[in-house]
Amino acid sequence: MSLISAVPLASSCVSKSLISSVREHTALRRAIATLQMSRRGKSVAASIRMSSATAGSDDGVKRRIGDYHSNLWDDNFIQSLSSPYGASSYGEHADRLIGEVKEIFNSFSIADGELISPVNDLLQQLWMVDNVERLGIDRHFQTEIKVALDYVYRYWSEEGIGCGRDSAFTDLNTTALAFRIFRLHGYTVSSDVFEHFKDQKGQFAASANDTELQTRSVFNLFRASLIAFPEEKVLEEAEKFAAAYLKAALQTLPVSGLSREIQYVFDYRWHSNLPRLEARSYIDILADNTISGTPDANTKKLLELAKLEFNIFHSVQQKELQCLWRWWKEWGCPELTFIRHRYVEFYTLVSGIDMVPEHATFRLSCVKTCHLITILDDMYDTFGTIDELRLFTAAVKRWDPSATECLPEYMKGVYMVLYETVNEMAKEAQKSQRRDTLGYVRQALEDYIGSYLKEAEWIATGYVPTFQEYFENGKLSSGHRIATLQPILTLSIPFPHHILQEIDFPSKFNDYAASILRLRGDTRCYKADSARGEEASCISCYMRDNPGSTQEDALNLINGMIEDMIKKLNWEFLRPDNNAPISSKKHAFNISRGLHHFYNYRDGYSVASKETKDLVIKTVLEPVLM
């Protein structure tokens, strides 16, 4: 059985659409609402139920249970999803619009030594780059973006940059926007440039007259501060100043595009932002501005292309989600009643960080890997006995179907879906990498399961480790490495050994990403984990190491560690002197952002909160109105 199916992309026309008009669009939202109401009653019984076929409920073994709700998404509803945007005519229309947007980029070029653009040419080009990136359509304009940034960078100085090449003064808005874009694209820029925008007291300050330009300038300063590297004190100061200023501004600003942009960045900072969610949000903002004002032709063209691209990928998402549903059903995953069934939520996350239609194999591999991680997590954390888990761990090291002979019945199915899926993904990776990568993945899997077994033994014996002991093991059990390694190997991007060393364990990149996931996950889950009998967490271990400390003390320390790790991860991702180019690290970094997104405010992974359900609806189930 092929576990990574060849998914039809945006090429086949679907005969009937749920989205071809406002009426049908409204009907889809009502169907989703009705579905959620009907499923809500089923998810109230949160404790895990065991079936004799899968969980040995009649074996007389006392087992711990989880407190997870059931799958929220009805099978028939998933299978009924359809979209007309896979038709070739939409792709042809998108190609024409792409050509027209390229002409906009080219209109800023120089002919016969004369600039064909207004006096604010630098800001205009930065605006174009920023907008195509926020709208999720930048992959079509990589050459144009490079030309634009190379041109603007020629005018960059230690004191910043003005809105035009002939500007007599630098300004904060253009400088902050340029700094952020340059850093994200690997250009060398120093944060010391912002020292020139402080007052005589050495502090950031705003004028008494609040204007939209001033608010926009501080907004771009705040965005720039979020990609700080370690020891950049000026960006720490900029973040504090900008955050306070913008929070106050939100109290007085009318509801507008700018206020919604500010709120979005507060809600989803760069390290937990999903590009597709940002695209959806920014499309809505620009669309509202178009209705309420008189947009220029460039904005209208960008918006038209962004909407069309969003909906074309929407048709891809539906096919891939249905493919995952078949895989999930064929392997009998719904019958494993002790696990969290979150394939829809996982797919939403993964398609939120990669919107390239041709990357179907990456997305499917990533979702399947995350679902396998969930099965193992729930089996080791709650359901399996310590003796069963030792048998399973030994079987994984053997890596042979015959190893199932000594396993309990429910574990045999778990072992085989793990074995077959990992092997099938390794075959896909071999096509991309031109070498066998199964050895890499098996070692990562053994390390991962070994860390789970250690935690299971702690639970079984009542042992509470030191903070450092728990943290080091927790970086492995976070699952970041296994969630990242095999999926990125299926990409067409080459990952020779020297580049893989910069991303995979024991690289600093992997260490910081795994640390963030472990620490943030614990701050969101420690109360629920403790209720299930899992005494060890970053919070409890810190308090045990430091008698007299409180939960608040532990959380303050851990939140500080997370902020520090985010800056270190930024550096490992964007450092210009790294052996691995940014393009090679981008997917691994975005997986880290996606996983962090699940824990943005709460455990959106175990409990599909309103925010999680809204995310599924806005980025997967619901198209944008053209």
Swiss-Prot record:
Q: Which GO terms describe its biological process?
A: diterpenoid biosynthetic process; green leaf volatile biosynthetic process; terpenoid biosynthetic process
Q: What InterPro entries does the record tag this protein with? A: Isoprenoid_synthase_dom_sf, Terpene_cyclase-like_1_C, Terpene_cyclase_plant_C1, Terpene_synth_N, Terpene_synth_N_sf, Terpene_synthase-like, Terpene_synthase_metal-bd, Terpenoid_cyclase/PrenylTrfase
Q: What is its main location?
A: plastid
Pfam families, per database record: Terpene_synth (PF01397), Terpene_synth_C (PF03936)
The organelle targeting sequence, given as a residue range: 1-45
Q: Could you list this entry's UniProt keywords, alphabetically sorted.
A: Chloroplast, Lyase, Magnesium, Metal-binding, Plastid, Transit peptide
Chain sites annotated for binding Mg(2+) 2: D377, D381
Task: List the catalytic activities from the record.
Answer: (2E)-geranyl diphosphate = (+)-car-3-ene + diphosphate
Q: Where does Mg(2+) 3 bind?
A: D529
The short motif DDXXD motif is annotated over 377-381
Obligatory cofactor(s): Mg(2+); Mn(2+)
Keyword Ligase in the entry? The reply is: no
Location(s) in or outside the cell? Plastid, Chloroplast
Cofactor: how bound: Binds 3 Mg(2+) or Mn(2+) ions per subunit.
Q: Name one GO cellular component term.
A: chloroplast
Q: Which domain of life, per UniProt?
A: Eukaryota
Name the residues that bind Mg(2+) 1.
D377, D381
Enzyme Commission designation: 4.2.3.107
Q: Which SUPFAM superfamilies match?
A: Terpenoid cyclases/Protein prenyltransferases (SSF48239), Terpenoid synthases (SSF48576)
In its UniProt record, a GO molecular function of this protein is:
terpene synthase activity
Q: What is known of its domains?
A: The Asp-Asp-Xaa-Xaa-Asp/Glu (DDXXD/E) motif is important for the catalytic activity, presumably through binding to Mg(2+).
Q: Which family does it belong to?
A: Belongs to the terpene synthase family. Tpsd subfamily.
Q: What is this protein called?
A: (+)-3-carene synthase 2, chloroplastic
The source organism is Pinus banksiana
Q: Which gene encodes it?
A: TPS-(+)3car2
